[in-house]
């Protein structure tokens, strides 16, 4: 197979992905005789969604892990699937209907759900098609959807079990309510941002007249409309201004109700007036106060956020914000408005509707998070124990604190949503006015049977609500493995092999909403942990650290980075759908300034390498497009290095049939140079590093190790050294070098494959047969490299380090003397003759030398600059500008003296010597010795020039 002259990623990607998939290379391993199993769960994206940068990053990490373990011979499963995404999907379909002037209520539940299924079938494949563009290798044959029949049965089964155990209940509680959607929403679906508002100061008169100089208590509130539902005013029990008033009552303005003054240390004495109105039905903090003090709860808003009939007649039916204006006017008219001050406050809004979220007291279904189960432990306690015992490990470890903190302060989980798209709650009610009995069952027939046992044989009505999307997501670790109610008596190979899975890769933003709930539900239902490790990564942001969002106009599409996009198309994409013309204009201008030529096509491998390199521990990941360019250059470098190897090895005797290992070094067939042994030794170190970094989930360090070996060691040094050996070596040396070129390159391709699958597959297909390692049809199934530490060669490594230092010194001399790179110069070198003679051919090639003259000593009368490289003195024969050379050496002496002073200071510091690692202290001593030795050689040189 002939290799193309240049790397064209699009053609390679289009060819190889269908090949991998059609050959079954992504299929789950189900060999139960193999004790090694690796499983990873794809956090299910919204079924009708599209791929964003967070997906691209997350999936690159998961695919790298999957390919790595697959190549190590593990049974491997990357479990893919999508989420029905209740709210998000329902909103999309409702908007489509709105455009036609139809509401979901016009259609009715059954027909509306049919429409959603139609939309799911139409757009549901978009994100999985995009995942394929990223080169991901999940077992697509096992793809799951949270509303598949099997997963839906699991949802019902777990709900019924938890209800029968008393761990699911229905009750009236305060929840986040989105009045535009008409449903409860989770904390994750609420975005709080600082906005400009006001702090209204309202006086509540004492019921029995003034107390001393006080006519009443003045409260400060940002929401005066909720005062209609006030049931108390609270003060801090130790506040000297008000403590004596606790137990008295005030008259609630506009409502003519008397409410008590209570003491509670929740009150911040320094904020506002130190008096706080208490509205338990419309504020989460007040709700907790209400429970502590056994206060009544008065809902003064309907579910559509209009004032309810529990409020004074004048305000009934008003929108909450209209009511606010009228109430403020009425308070002012009665002389009870003590003041208004501008105030910045956090306003909670629905992330999809932007409607202000209303804390609302409604009937909902809940999971009891802290109630002991049959075994005496709550599901939360079990989840805490899993991590405390080390059964589940977090990487980085600091996320354990976040996990524990949330679980230790957990509230019961509201799992019902007032939607039509989702898993309908399996609960049936007696369809009789005044009968509140409910029967939870697997189906209606079972519900009727349960009702009959309770003496009810009338008509049943199913609960209209559906379950929170996170409920079915919490079951993902076992529902996707075809768990059934008969488990463990009836199981299957996948469930036996892959529960628990090996690692969960997730962003820190869903530790509470998904990670903790998977631990709770999986442990409680199956008795097993869902996964052993949790790798928590940061969130992808733009180069300035800003969150990527449509409104900011800084969103990047991974597919655009792979394929490229013109400036016109990018501007059009970023401004599409924006309602504000000024905002659209600003975003277009910014986009054209940032990307005047658009975005070039980087290809999948360059993008994946970029994502891996950015996977550092931390909360934020700044995505810099220039990194993509750098890694595209890396791919080109690897491609060109392979072309060089093929040009020099195809049709040549590469010694591949010769015996491998140390014995080959002593045969006439193969004569390995110190350069050959060095690159093999460095490869072992790199393989060991990469393995350790994979174990530690340090993908940034995996990419760094691969990059530095390929670019810095193999391409920049070994290939150049190999050119010398191929041109001037004996047949046995040439054969050994060709063998090394091939074997190391083939190994490197396998080493890099998990990160950059397409280019490595394409190159491997050509290189592997020449390297004698083509024992499978794809690099995906080739064995992953493992370090052989017996092949470390410290002597060869030391020689190359010395050679690099000499070459570097020669290059510095050329640069300082402004010698053209094209001009070959003679070098005079003083030092150990046998060593310098062995280096000479390499020096001539790498430092552009016409000859290397080895001498015992460089004469003191020489005026050409003399540089020191370790134990050698080097001089290029060239006409010298004495003054300039004197200045150069003087500067170098001054620099070295400064470095020597720093090193001496460090070593004189007892704290440094005592506390620093011994290796660090030794390094500092060696640096000092090096400075001293170099200065001893440079000072005479300066004296010599000064004497002229």
From Swiss-Prot:
Pfam families: Anticodon_1, tRNA-synt_1, Val_tRNA-synt_C
Motif ('KMSKS' region): 547-551
SUPFAM superfamilies: Anticodon-binding domain of a subclass of class I aminoacyl-tRNA synthetases (SSF47323), Nucleotidylyl transferase (SSF52374), tRNA-binding arm (SSF46589), ValRS/IleRS/LeuRS editing domain (SSF50677)
Entry keywords, A to Z: Aminoacyl-tRNA synthetase, ATP-binding, Coiled coil, Cytoplasm, Ligase, Nucleotide-binding, Protein biosynthesis
Motif 'HIGH' region positions after renumbering to this chain: 45-55
Localisation per UniProt entry: Cytoplasm
Catalytic activity: tRNA(Val) + L-valine + ATP = L-valyl-tRNA(Val) + AMP + diphosphate
Record keyword Cell cycle present: no
Coiled-coil zones: 877-912
Listed GO MF terms: aminoacyl-tRNA deacylase activity; ATP binding; valine-tRNA ligase activity
Chain residues that bind ATP: 550
Gene Ontology BP term (one): valyl-tRNA aminoacylation
Entry EC no(s): 6.1.1.9
Notes on the domains: ValRS has two distinct active sites: one for aminoacylation and one for editing. The misactivated threonine is translocated from the active site to the editing site.
Family: Belongs to the class-I aminoacyl-tRNA synthetase family. ValS type 1 subfamily.
Assembly information from the UniProt record: Monomer.
Function: Catalyzes the attachment of valine to tRNA(Val). As ValRS can inadvertently accommodate and process structurally similar amino acids such as threonine, to avoid such errors, it has a 'posttransfer' editing activity that hydrolyzes mischarged Thr-tRNA(Val) in a tRNA-dependent manner.
HAMAP family for the chain: Val_tRNA_synth_type1
Protein's UniProt name: Valine--tRNA ligase
